[in-house]
Amino acid sequence: MATYSLANERLRALEDIEREIGAILQNAGTVILELSKEKTNERLLDRQAAAFTASVQHVEAELSAQIRYLTQVATGQPHEGSSYSSRKDCQMALKRLDYARLKLSEVARTCEQMLEN
């Protein structure tokens, strides 16, 4: 039963974060609307900017806490039957291979230029 309450608490925290992101978007919309006016209300802009910054910092802190928690409980093992990890490793290896080829071609060009001179 404690597991369910912990899971529900985590879900509620994520819902709160989602609501906070909605507030961030509303603050940004209010600022954009105010900036589109010929004469802007400086105090309103300052209040909205402060609220925006505070909300972003709060969301960042809460998401970091969620990530830390998930890092602690995760075993690090890929899901049985999942090939995501293997595919990602292959993609990264191919990117490293492409990068090595690019650098080798640059070295070859440099050598050719030095030999021409």
Swiss-Prot record:
Cysteines engaged in disulfide bonds, as pairs: none
A GO molecular function held by the record: transcription coregulator activity
Residue numbers carrying N-acetylalanine: A2
GO CC terms of this entry: mediator complex
Database matches in Gene3D superfamilies: 1.10.287.3490
Pfam families noted in UniProt: Med11
GO biological process, one term: regulation of transcription by RNA polymerase II
Keywords: Acetylation, Activator, Nucleus, Transcription, Transcription regulation
Compartments where found: Nucleus
Major localisation: nucleus
Domain of life according to the entry: Eukaryota
InterPro entries noted in UniProt: Mediator_Med11
Protein function: Component of the Mediator complex, a coactivator involved in the regulated transcription of nearly all RNA polymerase II-dependent genes. Mediator functions as a bridge to convey information from gene-specific regulatory proteins to the basal RNA polymerase II transcription machinery. Mediator is recruited to promoters by direct interactions with regulatory proteins and serves as a scaffold for the assembly of a functional pre-initiation complex with RNA polymerase II and the general transcription factors.
PANTHER family per UniProt: MEDIATOR OF RNA POLYMERASE II TRANSCRIPTION SUBUNIT 11 (PTHR22890)
Similarity remark: Belongs to the Mediator complex subunit 11 family.
Subunit and interaction comment: Component of the Mediator complex, which is composed of MED1, MED4, MED6, MED7, MED8, MED9, MED10, MED11, MED12, MED13, MED13L, MED14, MED15, MED16, MED17, MED18, MED19, MED20, MED21, MED22, MED23, MED24, MED25, MED26, MED27, MED29, MED30, MED31, CCNC, CDK8 and CDC2L6/CDK11. The MED12, MED13, CCNC and CDK8 subunits form a distinct module termed the CDK8 module. Mediator containing the CDK8 module is less active than Mediator lacking this module in supporting transcriptional activation.
Name the record gives this protein: Mediator of RNA polymerase II transcription subunit 11
Encoding gene per record: MED11
